[in-house]
Amino acid sequence: MSCCHPRGPARDGADESPTVEQNGILGSGPHLVETVSVPAGVFDMGDAFGEGYRTDGETPVHEVELNAFSIDTTAVTNAAFASFVAATGHRTDAETFGGSAVFHTYATAPGQAVPGTPWWLAVDGASWRHPAGPGSTLDGLADHPVVHVSHRDAQAYCDWAGRALPTEAQWEYAARGGRRGARYPWGDEPPTADDPRCTIFRGDFPNEPTGPVGTTPVRTFEPNGHGLYQCAGNVWEWCADRFSARYYRVSDRTDPSGPARGSARVLRGGSHLCHDSYCHRYRVAARSHNTPESTASNIGFRTVGPRDTRREPISTAVS
């Protein structure tokens, strides 16, 4: 379990995949998130600064070659996910199992503290529709990233939309925006109060924030060189790959897709709860993972697909 997002409790039926074929519309959904083409290329994947956690397996740095693909410019929004649910009747894991993990400062109801990470509360009734818990709504949050979605919920959306979750390599390549070996999507300079650049926790974590705590609209900050927004902070994003801390030692060079075995799935990007005092996983090389049924108020996703030939390719100039 990571301190950044709690592991989901053991749940009956947790090995069953969500079904999205209720209306015979598999693969036909209107994907309401803008996509951009990322050209084929080669990049150095992994932590070149020695700043990662040993158990996350961010090293060794290794060369990866990828074919072209398209990727969402933003995380999937509440509006886009609502369209999917309206079309399919999909019920998320958090709704099925009766609740989800909510950060304590904005939870609308009491909850049981998650062992080892007491700032996380298991709140009955929390879900994508009620992101802070009972009584909370999506009013004003249409353009915020959907949260409280499990890996299986994200995959169900992808199946409906004819998309896929990005491989970990696709995610990092796109997040780097053409910058070779940089710490962040924008370069090496850390965010500051005067130039925040990303949505992370500011103040004394976890009890004394100096500003609002929570998600922000998906286009709050400037995009990176590939046109992607908020690849650092805001919400963790599910990837397709299974997780192994040893995988970088044996990874394929071309279009790697992760280990063949393993129960946990990769998460990338950090969230609005990252803070350098305990978690600096909002770097582009940072890795995390969780069980596929896990949900929390800082976990979302974006999708990939074949290269969109209707769009002009974006430059990969290194700066």
PLM segments and residue spans:
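Short basic/aromatic-enriched segments
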Residues: 287
